[in-house]
Each structure stands twice: as structure tokens, then as C-alpha cells.
Swiss-Prot record:
Similarity comment: family membership: Belongs to the acireductone dioxygenase (ARD) family.
Protein name: Acireductone dioxygenase 3
Phylogenetic lineage: Eukaryota, Viridiplantae, Streptophyta, Embryophyta, Bryophyta
Residues involved in Ni(2+) binding: H96, H98, E102, H141
Cofactor(s) listed: Fe(2+); Ni(2+)
UniProt-listed GO biological process terms: L-methionine salvage from methylthioadenosine; methionine metabolic process
Length: 203
């Protein structure tokens, strides 16, 4: 009996400042990886599921029931399959927030979700087949395909599907303020406390 090949866990890293092709990885030199724990602290949820059997997968059913994801649809993101591809890809890569969670389950292909950390630096999240990711409401983010130019995803919603992007700046939006208070402010407060402690030690 052969050994089962394990798929890699979802990867994330800090992006460089290069303006080259958005489909490239954009690693810093040297690379700076970000843990799943760090992503969770920013409110980003992740599961690895059985994409080949999504219609009958009990784990997916459990997640949907627990989190109230009652509506689904599907999207193929590729030059061949997506109408108005160039326009939509450009819109996907505009930094924005939503007033609801963004839930995406990658059924095939791969792509990048970029999110901001508490210091406003970009973190690039690389999703593959089987990755299900949830970005919280109010989180600045954007999406890009990678060099494979293909991703098929299930989109999930709580109730009526709403996909209204609010492009940055949206810092006065109530949902953005709530996200800052829940996920960013605790990190910034810790940073301020750490800096104050360091300054006190040098006095």
C-alpha cells in the first residue's frame, strides 16, 4: 500500500513592495512567513476540506450549519470562463471591505487573498484546492489569481447573497470600526505597551 501524499497547508507571507505582475508570489527577501495562528488573530478562519466530495462532505455540512451559511453559488475565475475577465480581475484586486464575511471554498485551482496586518502591511494568503477561507467583515483585502490563471470556488453567504465592495478608504464605516476594535486594536495596544516598556528600560 503506497504512502498517502499530504497536501500542503495553506501558506501566507508578507509581501514585498514590487509593482511586478500581481500573479507572482511577491515574497520578501528573505521570505517572511505568517502562521495560521497569526491569521486567526486577525479574524481569518481556515479549514481543509474534501473538495472532490463537497456535495456530501459532512465536515462542510457541519460548518455551514454552525455558521449559518445557507446560500451558495459557484464561480470559475479564468480568462476563458469569467465574463468581462479583465474588468473583474481589476475590481477583485482593488483594496476593499465588505459588510459581511467573505467565504470562499477553493474546489480547484489556486489563488491569492491579500489582507492587511495591524501595521497596514500586506499579507499574501495562498489558497489551493480544498482550502476554505473566511475573511471577516471590515477586513481590508483583495484577490488575485496566481500564475496558473485558474480558480474554481464555492461562494457561501448567510441568507441573501450580498457582494458589495467598499473600496478603501472606509475607516469611518461602522463595520470597519468594529473590525479594528475586535482584531487590530488589541495588537496595536500590545505594541504600544511593548514600546513603552522598552523606552522605560532605556531611561
Amino acid at each position: 500500500m503506497g504512502l498517502e501524499v499530504q497536501r500542503p497547508l495553506m501558506e501566507a507571507w508578507y509581501m514585498d513592495d514590487s509593482a511586478e505582475d500581481q500573479r507572482m508570489p511577491h515574497h520578501r527577501n528573505p521570505p517572511e512567513y505568517v502562521s495560521l495562528k497569526k491569521l486567526a488573530e486577525l479574524g481569518i478562519l481556515h479549514w481543509v476540506l474534501d473538495a472532490d466530495n463537497y456535495e456530501t462532505d459532512p465536515d462542510l455540512k457541519h460548518i455551514r450549519k454552525e455558521r449559518g451559511y445557507s446560500y451558495e453559488d459557484f464561480v470559475d475565475v479564468s480568462p476563458e470562463a469569467l465574463p468581462n475577465y479583465e474588468t473583474k480581475i481589476k475590481n477583485f484586486y482593488e483594496e476593499h471591505i465588505h459588510t459581511d464575511e467573505e467565504i470562499r471554498y477553493c474546489l480547484d485551482g489556486s489563488g491569492y487573498f491579500d489582507v492587511r496586518d495591524p501595521e497596514d502591511r500586506w499579507i499574501r494568503i495562498w489558497v489551493h484546492k480544498g482550502d476554505m477561507i473566511v475573511l471577516p467583515a471590515g477586513c481590508y483585502h483583495r484577490f488575485s489569481l496566481d500564475a496558473n490563471n485558474y480558480l474554481k470556488a464555492m461562494r457561501l453567504f448567510v441568507g441573501e447573497p450580498i457582494w458589495t465592495p467598499y473600496n478603501r478608504p472606509q475607516d469611518e464605516h461602522p463595520v470597519r470600526k468594529e473590525y479594528i476594535n475586535l482584531f487590530l486594536k488589541p495588537h496595536l495596544d500590545k505594541s504600544d505597551l511593548s514600546l513603552a516598556t522598552q523606552n522605560a528600560e532605556t531611561v
